[in-house]
Amino acid sequence: MAKKQNILSPIIRITFTFLVLCGLVYPLIVTGIAQAVMKDNADGSLIYNDKNEVIGSTLIGQNFTDPRYFHGRVSSIEYKAEASGSNNYAPSNPDLEKRVEKSIEEWKKQNPSVPVTEVPIDLVTNSGSGLDPDISPKAASVQVERISKLTNIPKETLDQLIKDQTEGAALGLFGETRVNVLKLNLELQKIMK
């Protein structure tokens, strides 16, 4: 019996030590560093309105259906963050073709003047998470004509707005040039007022 206690005692001490280190100390240190170095990102990159109410996050896309606004990527989960993910069909899967064709048809209804061959792929396909907040600058640009027509905002103003909201690759290396749809639409809303 004494031999069993000799074996169990270090196991219990090691388990408790790692529980405290990994479950308490490490998370507190990482949270403290994140709050000190990049507070906005650590808090979820939230965007507030004039009344200091949260209206979204730069990290999670929103579904814009009003034709006067820029639209983001297609989301099979309807931008519900708790259901992150999408049906990542293989290129050979007929369901992918059906989904893309449906997205193209919806696109054509709202943007009849833009040839289908000019529709950027990111406007008719899902991202891996289904929550992508960004589109390519080209995906924003092909929507300018529709928005200009519906809002009477000159195309040049909308083009400049896209240019101002375009972000480069992180550290010049990671990712693509992109436009955050929520931030772009908030700037558009300021012009419309």
Swiss-Prot record:
The gene is kdpC. Keywords: ATP-binding, Cell membrane, Ion transport, Membrane, Nucleotide-binding, Potassium, Potassium transport, Transmembrane, Transmembrane helix, Transport. Its main location: membrane. The chain crosses the membrane at residues 14-34. This is Potassium-transporting ATPase KdpC subunit. NCBIfam families: kdpC, PRK00315.1, PRK13997.1. One of its GO terms (molecular function) is P-type potassium transmembrane transporter activity. Part of the high-affinity ATP-driven potassium transport (or Kdp) system, which catalyzes the hydrolysis of ATP coupled with the electrogenic transport of potassium into the cytoplasm. This subunit acts as a catalytic chaperone that increases the ATP-binding affinity of the ATP-hydrolyzing subunit KdpB by the formation of a transient KdpB/KdpC/ATP ternary complex. PANTHER family: POTASSIUM-TRANSPORTING ATPASE C CHAIN (PTHR30042), POTASSIUM-TRANSPORTING ATPASE KDPC SUBUNIT (PTHR30042:SF2).
